[in-house]
Amino acid sequence: MTFASKSLLLAAVFTAVLSGGLWHRLDSTRHDNQTLRRELQTEQQARHTAEWLLHGQEQTMQVFSAIRAANRAARLADETEHHDAKEKITTAITGDNCSTRPVPAVAADRLRELEKRTRAIGGDPARN
């Protein structure tokens, strides 16, 4: 075997080893790339799910906030109406002799009965 053929054989072996190493490295990189893509897809799905859940929670909080505001406004309107009615009645009976007499027991019982039925039908706002 001559020096040229030995050099050529050595270059061929070196090229084969180098090509094999590069081929292995390329295959390993492809496998890692596929794994990273799957992990990225899983993380993106988890993020989308979390965003969807958070959006649902935000909408729920907005609904409850609107309900709370409506209840507060209704309570304030009821209080205002009650106060206005009380003032109108007080003004209307001022100076009338019926304002100094006690309410008959039968009338008071009837009013209590009406109040109980009204609260039972519409719910007791004092309990809310």
Curated annotation (Swiss-Prot):
Compartments it resides in: Host cell inner membrane
Induction note: Expressed in the intermediate phase of the viral replicative cycle.
Keywords, ordered alphabetically: Coiled coil, Cytolysis, Host cell inner membrane, Host cell lysis by virus, Host cell membrane, Host membrane, Membrane, Signal-anchor, Transmembrane, Transmembrane helix, Viral release from host cell
Membrane topology note: Single-pass type II membrane protein
Coiled coil feature spans: 24-51
Membrane-spanning residues: 7-23
Domain of life: Viruses
One term under GO cellular component: membrane
GO biological process terms held by the UniProt record: killing of cells of another organism
Function: Component of the spanin complex that disrupts the host outer membrane and causes cell lysis during virus exit. The spanin complex conducts the final step in host lysis by disrupting the outer membrane after endolysin action has degraded the host peptidoglycans. Host outer membrane disruption is possibly due to local fusion between the inner and outer membrane performed by the spanin complex.
Oligomer status and interactors: Interacts with the spanin outer membrane subunit. Part of the spanin complex which spans the entire periplasmic space. The spanin complex is composed of spanin inner membrane subunit and spanin outer membrane subunit.
Name listed for the protein in its UniProt record: Spanin, inner membrane subunit
Organism: Escherichia phage Mu (Bacteriophage Mu)
